[in-house]
Amino acid sequence: MAHKKAGGSSRNGRDSESKRLGVKRFGGQVVRAGNIIVRQRGTHFHPGDNVGCGRDYTLFALTEGRVEFKVKGPAGRKYVSVIPA
């Protein structure tokens, strides 16, 4: 029989869409209230002064000011604060 049968389908070809996580405003940058500072899964960065934390752990500015990153405590937790201008 000179017929070519259908080839098997590949098991590859799937990948999830990137989630665009990470730091959006870096230390020293000026932010306005509501600006997103960090998008993250879990609290890699913790909210400090004038920073709010959303349902999905997104950190955002509560006031206008300058972004500041700090490491505090014996656990070495990273905190993000907004220093009012």
UniProtKB/Swiss-Prot annotation:
Domain of life: Bacteria
A GO cellular-component term linked to this record: cytosolic large ribosomal subunit
Ribonucleoprotein among keywords: yes
Keywords of this entry: Ribonucleoprotein, Ribosomal protein
UniProt region (Disordered), positions on chain: 1-23
One Pfam family, short name: Ribosomal_L27
GO terms classed as biological process: translation
Annotated InterPro entries: Ribosomal_bL27 (IPR001684), Ribosomal_bL27_CS (IPR018261)
Keyword check for Ribonucleoprotein: yes
GO MF term list: structural constituent of ribosome
Family statement drawn from the similarity comment of this UniProt entry: Belongs to the bacterial ribosomal protein bL27 family.
HAMAP family in the cross-refs: Ribosomal_bL27
Entry protein name: Large ribosomal subunit protein bL27
Source organism: Methylococcus capsulatus (strain ATCC 33009 / NCIMB 11132 / Bath)
Encoding gene (name): rpmA
